[in-house]
């Protein structure tokens, strides 16, 4: 599962670098496609190499991938926070979506969705210390379930 998640994250990263649709701003320091609010159409899915991909980046995708792609994700985090700052970062963290191809002032969806904010917090902590994964894996119910499924240490 870890390797599959890493591969999926790297697909997003490489897609943004290749940028086949020529969207402004996408690249090594701006990638991450998933369901989120969108400055053009409201809440929708953004998937690489589909009609739904319109240049909108969902910060949660790259930020939440930090355990799988630490260098690539940290590049996005630094770019969003230090270079774009208040354009993409608000009181509760990164806004839900950003599309650099749009007119300034219309590029950012200034919403905070729990389904997008929550994974960022948890995965940053897992990257930092492994805390949440470690607590989860020590729960007796989880150990029992894994044992019943044939998993061994």
Where are these regions (language model features)?
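Ser/Thr/Asn(+Pro)-rich, low-complexity disordered segments
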Residues: 1-153
């Amino acid at each position: 599962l870890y390797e599959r998640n890493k591969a999926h994250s790297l697909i997003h990263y490489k897609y943004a670098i290749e940028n086949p649709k020529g969207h402004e701003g996408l690249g090594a320091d701006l990638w991450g496609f998933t369901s989120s609010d969108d400055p053009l159409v409201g809440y929708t899915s953004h998937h690489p190499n589909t009609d739904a991909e319109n240049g909108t980046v969902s910060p949660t995708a790259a930020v939440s991938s930090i355990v799988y792609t630490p260098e690539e994700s940290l590049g996005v985090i630094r770019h969003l926070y230090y270079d774009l700052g208040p354009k993409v970062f608000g009181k509760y963290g990164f806004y839900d979506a950003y599309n650099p191809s749009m007119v300034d002032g219309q590029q950012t969806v200034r919403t905070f969705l729990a389904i997008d904010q929550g994974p960022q917090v948890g995965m940053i902590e897992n990257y930092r210390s492994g805390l949440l994964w470690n607590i989860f894996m020590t729960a007796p119910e989880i150990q029992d379930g894994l044992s019943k499924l044939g998993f061994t240490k």
